[in-house]
From Swiss-Prot:
Disruption phenotype: Cells lacking this gene lose the ability to utilize ethanol as the sole growth substrate. NCBIfam families: mycofact_MftB. It comes from the Bacteria. The gene is mftB. This is Peptide chaperone MftB.
Length: 102
């Protein structure tokens, strides 16, 4: 019997991130649905600011810059950073650098 151990990536808000290439974003009135075709996982984004940040991550050098561009003040970033960290743990987001791409 073979078991695969997925490499656990730790979210660092000071590095580049992007959507996994197998993730589709479907806009919804409440925010968006993310569907990972590789893992068949579904995530609900219930905040339009989070949707904006997730969609723009690849355009910014790091997650904090994406949050600032979306109008999230430094002292308001904690819940957004937590949400991005959860998306990293579920493999919806991956490092933006070529070495970490999947």
């Amino acid at each position: 019997m073979s078991t695969q151990v997925a490499e656990q990536i730790t979210f660092d808000p000071d590095v580049s991130w992007r959507l996994h290439h197998q993730v589709a974003v479907r806009p919804e009135p409440f925010g968006a649905l993310l569907y990972h075709f590789g893992t068949r996982k579904l995530s609900f984004l219930k905040n339009r600011t989070v949707v904006e940040v997730v969609n723009s991550l690849a355009d910014h050098p790091d997650a904090r810059s994406a949050l600032c561009a979306a109008g999230v003040a430094d002292d308001q970033q904690a819940p957004y950073l937590h949400a991005l960290g959860v998306l990293v743990q579920s493999n919806m987001l991956v490092p933006g650098n070529p070495e970490g791409s999947q």
